[in-house]
Amino acid sequence: MDLVFCTEARLVRRSSGLVYSIDGGLTNNLWQRYLCKFNHVYVMARVLSDDDCPINDKYLASSERVSFIDLPYYLGPIQYLKTRRKLNKIVANSLMPGCVYICRVPGEIGTLVADHLRRCKVPYGVEVVGDPWDVFAPGAVRHPFRVFFRYRGTYDLKRTVVRAAAALYVTENQLQKRYPVNNSVFSISASDVQISSRNLPSSEKVLYKKEKYNLLSVGSLEQMYKAPDVVLEALALLKDRGVYCRLTWLGEGKNKGEMQKLASALHITNDVNFKGNVSREEVDEELKNSDLFLLVSRTEGLPRALIEAMAMGLPCIGTQVGGIPELLNKQMLIRAGDSLALANKIEILLTHIDMA
């Protein structure tokens, strides 16, 4: 039996025929969890045919027994509306009798495919990996239709999940509460985060008192989901209190320049390093060299970066959103968007080392 995997992920196809994941979310490692049960995997996703688009060679999505159903490549709601008719036509013509369908949601593609399958009376499963109610919360996204997207996305996800024949959630409880399946439907919680044993520390991380501490945060700056502004404001508050820290931020995006300006306005430019996108090896090196990991997101599913930091033995501070409370002790949690609470938590942690 074959599987059709429908996802919002964006892919790039080279003239060689090889397909790569833009953000590294869909690679050979992911396919193995399906190929052990299915003969072949068909990936239905947006695909850009381009030889010049910069891509990490390690993000190879092509694999034996994996094929791709190319959907029109679009970015944002306006381009989506322009391509919606074409998307509907391709999806309708690509439905294959006898296949198992998994729709990764939230996302327009997963929702669109699920609607087609329902009309054709074809059962489907869902992988619930995020929460539009949090994604479009105040401060997370700057868009004139943010409120509309928030309510519409939440409605669509509830509708798609409740009609599913099976569901996998990346959280233990959070997403299940807001987006439940029908009582008779099988559901399970599982994470696709894989930690290589070679990356695990040989000994526990020991936090020593020092003149300046190294803080690390990871996340795209394309949107304000990861709250870089909150981290910068907390860093400035700590500096005023005589608690000196240096922040390294891994991740690129359109808000990087604005965050650099904010750091300058807060007089902490020399204390912040926006390194942009880096290799897997560089991420591991930063984790090894850091004293404290921060993930103060405004929205989350089950955060891969936080799990990796915890696996490295790093003390971590997070927010009370998504799956973060399922990973961290209550002592290490703050309200989303609260820079004062973050500064207080960091100061307490660094001046009471035994909490780590």
For the regions a protein language model found, what residue spans apply to each?
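Short alpha-helical donor nucleotide-sugar binding micro-motif in glycosyltransferases
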Residues: 95, 277-278, 285-290
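Donor nucleotide-sugar binding/catalytic pocket of nucleotide-sugar-dependent glycosyltransferases
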Residues: 146-210, 214
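Conserved donor-binding/catalytic core segment of Leloir-type glycosyltransferases
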Residues: 206-226, 232-235
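Nucleotide-activated donor-binding/catalytic signature segment of Leloir-type glycosyltransferases, i.e.
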Residues: 260-278
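Aromatic "clamp/platform" in nucleotide-sugar-dependent glycosyltransferases that forms part
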Residues: 298
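Short hydrophobic beta-strand element within catalytic cores of glycosyltransferases
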Residues: 315-318
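Short acidic/histidine- and often glycine-rich active-site loop of Leloir-type glycosyltransferases
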Residues: 321-333
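Conserved acidic donor-binding segment of nucleotide-sugar-dependent glycosyltransferases
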Residues: 331-340, 348-353
